[in-house]
Amino acid sequence: MILYPSVDDLLKQVNSRYSLIMLASKRAHELDAGAAPMLSEYKSVKTIGRAMEEIAAGDLMIDPDETDKD
């Protein structure tokens, strides 16, 4: 269960729970692979939590061009 950032705060940045999970999991994999962090400080030690913090901060968003490919 995540406490910070809250799911409600995250859903203000991303339009659906499915999109939120896909975005966060892809970013977490990038962080695991050594991608540079977008924030200077994180509350979470896990990459999935860090990805969600980046989403909540507005630094990580879904590419609108990618959503039109379906």
Swiss-Prot record:
Gene Ontology terms describing biological process: DNA-templated transcription
Protein name: DNA-directed RNA polymerase subunit omega
Organism: Lactiplantibacillus plantarum (strain ATCC BAA-793 / NCIMB 8826 / WCFS1)
E.C. numbers: 2.7.7.6
Lineage per the UniProt record: Bacteria, Bacillati, Bacillota, Bacilli, Lactobacillales
Gene3D superfamilies: 3.90.940.10
Catalytic reaction equation(s): RNA(n) + a ribonucleoside 5'-triphosphate = RNA(n+1) + diphosphate
GO cellular component term of the entry, any: DNA-directed RNA polymerase complex
Molecular-function annotations in GO: DNA binding; DNA-directed RNA polymerase activity
Subunit comment: The RNAP catalytic core consists of 2 alpha, 1 beta, 1 beta' and 1 omega subunit. When a sigma factor is associated with the core the holoenzyme is formed, which can initiate transcription.
Disulphide bridges: none
Xref: PANTHER family: DNA-DIRECTED RNA POLYMERASE SUBUNIT OMEGA
Function of the molecule: Promotes RNA polymerase assembly. Latches the N- and C-terminal regions of the beta' subunit thereby facilitating its interaction with the beta and alpha subunits.
Record family assignment: Belongs to the RNA polymerase subunit omega family.
Keywords (A to Z) from UniProt: DNA-directed RNA polymerase, Nucleotidyltransferase, Transcription, Transferase
